[in-house]
Structures are given as structure tokens and as C-alpha cells.
Amino acid sequence: MDDLSLRLVPDELWALVEPLIPGFTTRPQRGGTAPVDDRAVFTAIVFVLTSGCPWRLLPPSFGVTVPTAHRRFTRWTKAGLWRRMHQAVLDELGAQGLIDWSRAVVDGASVRAKKGEP
């Protein structure tokens, strides 16, 4: 694993995320393809999401093809991975006392619609 990959997904983050990743089922096709490492896929997705890089320009250095990365992103999104990961990170930071909830901001807006108007 190269330096960029370790900066994007440090071992501590991967330890939190790995148990949350849904099981992978191979696609039925002739000959099949070699399974791709979940950490490599996760790292490629993090790169796309944090860099603003378009999916189609995902560097091959991650060892993941664009279709594989996007397919897993879609599957993991439908499975609720990102919400569960966010909660796991908050739980871990909270357990370490690294979140100062006294400075949290809650924002909400409510505007009453006039009767008969959209």
C-alpha cells in the first residue's frame, strides 16, 4: 500500500470500516474475475469523493477499475455503509473524548406555507 492510500485510509479508519462493509457476492459470468480487495476499493472511493476527481479519471494506481469502484460505491450506498461508518467514527471519537458537544450547532428551518399556495 502506498503513502497516498495510507493517508486516505489510515489503519485506524480501516479497522472501524472493515467490519461494516457488506459481504461481496461474485457476479456470475464465464471465467469470472479475480476478487478486488475491499480496502483498495474503499480507498479509491475515498479518493474520488475527497478529491473531486471524476469517476472516469480514477488513477489506475489504486488497482481498481472505474466500473468496479462505482459499482461497489452504489452497492455500499444502498446498504447504508456511509451512514453506519459516520456513526462508528462519531462513536469512536466520542469514546476518546475528542468531540466537544458544547460547541455543536443544530440548525433547522421551518416556514409555514400560506393556505392555498405551494
Question: Which residues fall in each region the model found?
Answer:
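Short alpha-helical elements
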Residues: 1-118
